[in-house]
């Protein structure tokens, strides 16, 4: 919804693995969907249901923890980004706080990646201009480009 507010002339496509999340997002964004400004799909980041060079921007907020393999997932994001497109990742955990371990202990399949792991996987997927920032609370934000 916030991306729609910031992109009054754009089209937003949302993808989530969870059917429950897809239905909630469709309900929240009903007006924009009816206007043709938004679509929400169920999908898997390991095999994104889009053609190459489809998007100017791909975001991942609090989600890469649950991707089965970030290397393959980042390659999929790279594939669907247009040349010059941006990939933005925001995580509340940076993998360096001992408190992070409690989450991986109670949430099956969750992996908290360090900035170094994310940067390496982005580079291996072909991304350039990679910037990774962290704050004092442990939040991590990575931004990079597809340039080719």
Task: Give a label for each model feature.
Residues 46-58:
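A short acidic, Gly/Pro-enriched loop at the edge of an enzyme's catalytic core
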Residues 10, 52-54, 84-85:
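Surface-exposed loop/turn positions
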Residues 71-83:
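A short glycine-rich, Lys/Arg-flanked "PGG" loop and its adjoining helix->strand segment in the class I
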Residues 56-70:
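A short SAM/SAH-binding and catalytic strip from SAM-dependent methyltransferases
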Residues 75, 85-143:
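C-terminal alpha-helical "lid/dimerization" subdomain adjacent to the S-adenosyl-L-methionine
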Residues 19-20, 65, 139:
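Short alpha-helical
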Residues 1-47:
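Class I SAM-dependent methyltransferase SAM/SAH-binding core
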Residues 144-148:
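C-terminal beta-strand of the catalytic ATP-binding
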């Amino acid at each position: 919804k916030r991306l729609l507010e910031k992109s009054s002339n754009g089209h937003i496509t949302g993808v989530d693995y969870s059917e429950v999340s897809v239905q909630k997002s469709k309900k929240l964004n009903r007006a924009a969907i009816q206007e043709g400004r938004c679509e929400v799909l169920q999908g898997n980041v390991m095999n994104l249901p889009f053609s190459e060079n489809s998007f100017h921007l791909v975001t991942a907020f609090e989600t890469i923890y649950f991707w089965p393999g970030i290397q393959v997932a980042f390659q999929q994001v790279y594939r669907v980004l247009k040349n010059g497109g941006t990939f933005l990742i925001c995580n509340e955990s940076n993998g360096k706080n001992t408190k992070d371990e409690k989450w991986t202990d109670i949430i099956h399949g969750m992996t908290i990646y360090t900035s170094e792991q994310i940067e390496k996987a982005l580079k291996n997927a072909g991304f350039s201009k990679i910037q990774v920032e962290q704050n004092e609370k442990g939040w991590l934000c990575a931004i990079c480009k597809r340039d080719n």
